[in-house]
Every structure is written in structure tokens, then in C-alpha cells.
């Protein structure tokens, strides 16, 4: 029996490589910035590999509730009373079929940018782990990119019941 050694490097994706270092408490996206999928360059990923890591565990990739307004891109606005801080919790999933628009250079092409990241990770000889918790969702869960025929979580719930 041969055991395989795994060394996992966990990244809170929105912080890695963020050029804004002076965070404003309860600051907005414009004030505090956000890392992007494209910040994970071949050079940076190869450096992670050279440190001896075999896997990269990306946290906060799936679209979650936020106070950043992406309604111009067809993404529903979240009510601020149910969002944790301005950036939101990466575990308040808003759409399991989409990625966080904050992490994209171009919001309409966010999935292409994410898929390119996965390819870069594999090209660097690393495995990609996507962090998610299957039973944690935002209060206003609603997919805007779900496959045809896929019902949203809670769509058939009886709203008259507690």
C-alpha cells in the first residue's frame, strides 16, 4: 500500500494579491478592493508548487451575498440587512451555479476567467479544490445562471410555514 502525500494550500480568494493593503473597517468594494482570478498567474502558482504544495483550496469562489451592486450585469441586489458586512460571507451562497463577480476583471466573463484559473492551476502541476458548504445559502438565494429546468433552492417551499 502506497500512501500519497498531500500538502494543501488554502487561499481566501478575495484577499490573495489584493493591491489595496489599507483596509477600511466596513469598507466598500471600491475602498478595500478585491483580488481577481487573474492574479493567480503562472508564476505565483508555480511558486506555490515549489513550496511543496500539491493542492490549492480556493475559498469564497462561489457567488455569495454581497452589498456590491451588480444589477447592471443582471445579478440581483442583496438586501443589506441580511449580508454579513459589505463583502458578505463566502458561505452565504447566493447561486451555486455561478462564481463571485467581485473576483472577475470582467463580470460578464467571470466564468471564463474562473475556468482559465482552473487550467492554470492544473498547468502548474497542482490540484484544484473548490470550497463550499452544501447546506449554507444566502437568505435571498436565486440563481441567474442555473441550467434550464433546475429549480432554485426553496422555490417549492411553503412560505406560510415557519
Task: Spell out what each predicted region is.
Residues 1-127, 135-161:
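N-terminal structural segment of carbohydrate-active enzymes
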